[in-house]
Amino acid sequence: MSIVVKNNIHWVGQRDWEVRDFHGTEYKTLRGSSYNSYLIREEKNVLIDTVDHKFSREFVQNLRNEIDLADIDYIVINHAEEDHAGALTELMAQIPDTPIYCTANAIDSINGHHHHPEWNFNVVKTGDTLDIGNGKQLIFVETPMLHWPDSMMTYLTGDAVLFSNDAFGQHYCDEHLFNDEVDQTELFEQCQRYYANILTPFSRLVTPKITEILGFNLPVDMIATSHGVVWRDNPTQIVELYLKWAADYQEDRITIFYDTMSNNTRMMADAIAQGIAETDPRVAVKIFNVARSDKNEILTNVFRSKGVLVGTSTMNNVMMPKIAGLVEEMTGLRFRNKRASAFGSHGWSGGAVDRLSTRLQDAGFEMSLSLKAKWRPDQDALELCREHGREIARQWALAPLPQSTVNTVVKEETSAATTADLGPRMQCSVCQWIYDPAKGEPMQDVAPGTPWSEVPDNFLCPECSLGKDVFDELASEAK
């Protein structure tokens, strides 16, 4: 099946609804992906890219339904990665002498994957052109390290279509091809996820390369990407977003992520978040347990944030493995213009938080004070966590904080209500976790100020997951 992109340009790619892992298991493609290949039929017939190698046979068969393979005059490979050029071996077995136009670096990559140095390679550089008849040309633009050394874009004159390779794409599968036909919220979420997780390390190259392309003064009516939608409605909107994202991007947002062995570090994360929100209600705060969350969603939130707080328990004097792995990945992504703070709990010996602070600094984050707690944090320790959050909110504020005494008044009233109206704290008889009515249990939607009698019957202890029936009134408060 083919789809008309514009005039004599047809999409002949492959949708992949089922793919859930990309680049090994490093990128979760929760909404599938597509491998976009384009057939241009002018006086000369040109195929731009192929599809992922696992669809090689289907691709060649479908292409054969569109055109006699012997009538393909040129093959353009914008990128040699296997999700772009994976079907080359299957295709070239049918038309082995067809010229392949690509960068010099692409020849090395293609031969490294396909092992056919005898293919008819033709090296192109920025500004080189290829006449395809009917007054039209292909213009080639090298884009090294966006995101491989071999990468390039191809522009078709006359139709004013930019075949942009990985740039401006997204791992997003939909039966509709064009950007104005799909769910806009989904689309732009996937665009940002794609940029944050794949292109962020190369942000310093994005702006000059876009500027170079714009310097050709060529009209762009469409941007035909290698993955996801074709931008036909206001195609420059995604270009403008890339320029914004490449410029040390941040929002008024803080991301907290952690791993924990006994929920102690989780308790710290919750209290820190409470302190941040109490001091700066304008800032968006998101908390993730790395063991239970989509890693790429965490990294996308880090990309959006002005700062991150990373928490870990201490295990064998070092940080938890999932935290170590995620920090290593952040190092590779080379985030800029972001602050960080490390926190965590430990038992008889620490070490993880200091190690984590060093790793975050090495990753390029501007470091703020770290925070440690021994064993399970008690009420005093949790208050220190909240105060840490308040201080973070003050230090990281992008604008002057609101001058208000509301929080102070509310805090005084809540404190009075805790002792006068909310009843005693309750302690789990199994693990000793304490429910404080003044603080509630946000992870189970129990709001601060909820007395034990109003806590839902399906409440479970956050530590041992047992029900309300194992709780007793805290001994020190029993009458």
Swiss-Prot record:
Spell out the molecular function terms from Gene Ontology. electron transfer activity; FMN binding; iron ion binding; nitric oxide reductase activity
Supply the CDD domains for this chain: flavodiiron_proteins_MBL-fold (cd07709), rubredoxin (cd00730)
Residue sites binding FMN per the record: 260-264, 342-369
Q: Where in the cell is it found?
A: Cytoplasm
At which positions is Fe cation 2 bound? 83, 166, 227
**Where is region (Zinc metallo-hydrolase) located?**
30-210
Name the cofactor(s): Fe cation; FMN
Q: Which residues bind Fe cation 1?
A: 79, 81, 147, 166
Q: Where does Fe cation 3 bind?
A: 428, 431, 461, 464
What SMART domains does its record include? Lactamase_B (SM00849)
**Lineage: superkingdom:** Bacteria
Q: Which GO terms describe its cellular component?
A: cytoplasm
Q: What are the protein's UniProt keywords?
A: Cytoplasm, Electron transport, Flavoprotein, FMN, Iron, Metal-binding, Oxidoreductase, Transport
Q: How is the cofactor bound?
A: Binds 3 Fe cations per monomer.
Q: How is the quaternary structure described?
A: Homotetramer.
Q: Which family does it belong to?
A: In the N-terminal section; belongs to the zinc metallo-hydrolase group 3 family.
Instruction: Enumerate the NCBIfam families for this protein.
Output: PRK05452.1 (NF003954)
Q: What protein name applies here? A: Anaerobic nitric oxide reductase flavorubredoxin
